[in-house]
């Protein structure tokens, strides 16, 4: 059966630059790699075709020969009986430079895996987030075995060199004229085997444990902030470095304040007499109570800014402000005397609309009148 064109295999044009070829190779290699398609013979065959095409088309001399003579350039007797370019190719160079970053391949022994990072969600009150706090947390994790100290081998013994790869962590497989290096299936790339495993960790070098940590939360953090504790994640495999622990901050809803950036907001209810005449009222801050002066004729929704009464950001800079939004309350539970006084007040305003004393009401009702006048014209 005729071999498929190398350019068609990679899906590139015959004028494609090397970077286009590498890009196409990475995409296809990830799709058809045996590690992702275990037991799929068609994918394995396709992967071999992709590797072969890549090796030829990224070698300037081989590509020129292929462009001139096609597949015959690499067959015995090709190019006038010179034997083409077969036999001596070492595909491990390609894996090391291009493919190793995807699947961990390449030459040399595979390094023991770094420990996994861990995440802990920490809920804080607003006061804790603003002032800072130290909290103890308990984390289920994998820690280095204290008996074998991460080696996985029983005391008095040690890991032995893998007889399959002789400690290299890689084995060489010949595929046609290619010599391809792959991770040793016997030792999984470590280059060593544990013949006499530790009784506590059973050769894993790590044990399950729940550890207690004291975490210092800096002042000014907010929901979404993340604190990294280096080396407090899971222990690495066979002595490799530990991962990190990330503490994710979530600030609980507060009964009085809402936070927006470095500013705090709160609603301050006042009665309608204070709104009309003015006065002073106590308002809460995170540092205690302070007096807020309310000027006469204050309307619902008016904001009063108290500078420096907000939050100082964990990232530095000026402290935020506290913004108090006034809500004018309608009186309830009135007695007869109070109702009579309000009626007299209403009459003094000139009726329910009180146009002289309620500029917004006058503007509203003037607009309503114009609307209906326009409808009847």
From Swiss-Prot:
The record's GO CC annotations read:
cytoplasm
* SMART domains assigned to the protein according to its UniProt record, in alphabetical order: DnaJ (SM00271)
How is the cofactor bound here? Binds 2 Zn(2+) ions per monomer.
Which residues does the annotation say bind Zn(2+) 1?
A: 145, 148, 198, 201
A single GO molecular-function term is: ATP binding
Q: Name one GO biological process term.
A: DNA replication
Q: Which residues of this UniProt protein bind Zn(2+) 2?
A: 162, 165, 184, 187
Membership in a protein family: Belongs to the DnaJ family.
Function field: Participates actively in the response to hyperosmotic and heat shock by preventing the aggregation of stress-denatured proteins and by disaggregating proteins, also in an autonomous, DnaK-independent fashion. Unfolded proteins bind initially to DnaJ; upon interaction with the DnaJ-bound protein, DnaK hydrolyzes its bound ATP, resulting in the formation of a stable complex. GrpE releases ADP from DnaK; ATP binding to DnaK triggers the release of the substrate protein, thus completing the reaction cycle.
Quaternary context: Homodimer.
Q: What is this protein called?
A: Chaperone protein DnaJ
